[in-house]
Amino acid sequence: MPIIQRIFARQILDSRGNPTVEVDVFTDSSFGRAAVPSGASTGVHEAVELRDGDKEFYLGKSVMKAVENVNTIINDELSGMLVTEQSEIDNALLQLDGTPNKSKLGANAILGVSLACAKAGADYSGLPLYRYIGGTLATQLPVPMMNVLNGGAHADNNVDFQEFMIMPIGFDTFSDALRCGAEVFHALKSLLKSKGLNTAVGDEGGFAPNVKSNEEAIELVIEAVGKAGYKIGNSTANGGLGDGQVMIALDPASSEFYDTEKKKYVFKKSSGQELTSEEMAAYWESWTEKYPIISIEDGMAEDDWAGWKLLTDKIGKRVQLVGDDLFVTNTERLAEGIEKGVGNSILIKVNQIGTLTETLQAIDLARRNGYTSVISHRSGETEDTTIAQIAVATNAGQIKTGSLSRTDRIAKYNELLRIEEQLDTEAIYPAKKAFRV
């Protein structure tokens, strides 16, 4: 029987050189390892990432307390349990912590254990993780959101919006879609060089040039698609996706430039323009009429429910509106959004909620209410590829895991290539069917 014999955690470094938690789970016949990601722009409603705060060690970002919690409290509680009983393990972790936001043990400690247990269970079962979680129906590869140009909190430039992404929707296989993304990435690099712009990359591997405006940023991405030999899609103003091969997705991370005192969106990095919620919603409406935008994540601030409702009423029938800081992978926040009729999609970040079971519950709630799910990385990543497995396990249809550079991002794409190869003729690439708008 796959009984947990030992759970051991260590402190490792993420892609930004900050400490994070890695967990090993040992049973009498299997092994699982998971590393925990970390975000730069984090929602106030996220589960608590436990850090030590001692400025003499990693500038206060050390996670040795979370590591200690795994090696003592959690190890003592879970040793002897069946590693294949995922929901029981996760429930035990929640009860052991006992707080609504996992602040006692730390979401980083809890998540590392939850995911490592799932991997040990898969190892015991002789199955890849996506089959172990999703069963025989786990056959759908995700359409990637590829972050090719960075701004906001992810880059030291004068662009307000955090991510400008491409989505290859006009292809039959994941491997062809990935090739498109890589070729557009290199075309964008050449384009930036030709204009004398910086080709250094941000946290997620996208370029971070100092361009004149937010408009110039999206126009550079659109131009690069054409230079790579691909057809850019049309504006969704009249509904439908047309016959374009590539569409644009945005993550403005609007909470980052929302002034809670003024109750206005302030473009601090560029023009200094200040917009009310009504004006911000109208701004995005105008952009979707002008540009081939299929998805906007966090187009409004995390607690601007009225603004989210305005935006959803304006463009929610033709543009995917993804809640990240709004929903924080939390079923209670998502249920509130569903009731209020805001957004139509949820970003799924495993470390926002803290256990695999809760993550799967959020995806299920979204699906039952007609919301799409986008499985996502964080800006601080590791070589861990669990999110690629979860994307296929849940048939989510979309994944957001960075640009076509930096090994911490490429690791997820390479894992999806391997899964596509394993699935062979069963593999499905949803293309335009990944969207419900």
UniProtKB/Swiss-Prot annotation:
InterPro entries according to UniProt: Enolase (IPR000941), Enolase-like_C_sf (IPR036849), Enolase-like_N (IPR029017), Enolase_C (IPR020810), Enolase_CS (IPR020809), Enolase_N (IPR020811)
Free-text function comment from the UniProt entry: Catalyzes the reversible conversion of 2-phosphoglycerate (2-PG) into phosphoenolpyruvate (PEP). It is essential for the degradation of carbohydrates via glycolysis.
Binding site for Mg(2+): D251, E297, D324
Organism, scientific name: Chloroherpeton thalassium (strain ATCC 35110 / GB-78)
Involved pathway(s): Carbohydrate degradation; glycolysis; pyruvate from D-glyceraldehyde 3-phosphate: step 4/5
Binding site for (2R)-2-phosphoglycerate: Q162, K349, R378, S379, K400
One Gene Ontology term, aspect cellular component: phosphopyruvate hydratase complex
GO molecular function, one term: phosphopyruvate hydratase activity
Family recorded in the similarity comment: Belongs to the enolase family.
Keyword Lipid biosynthesis listed: no
Domain of life: Bacteria
Protein keywords: Cytoplasm, Glycolysis, Lyase, Magnesium, Metal-binding, Secreted
Positions of the catalytic residues: E204, K349
GO process terms (BP): glycolytic process
Electron transport among keywords: no
Compartments it resides in: Cytoplasm; Secreted; Cell surface
Official protein name in the record: Enolase
Enzyme Commission designation: 4.2.1.11
Cofactor, free-text remark: Binds a second Mg(2+) ion via substrate during catalysis.
Major location category of this protein: cytoplasm
Catalyzed reactions: (2R)-2-phosphoglycerate = phosphoenolpyruvate + H2O
Cofactor(s) for this UniProt protein: Mg(2+)
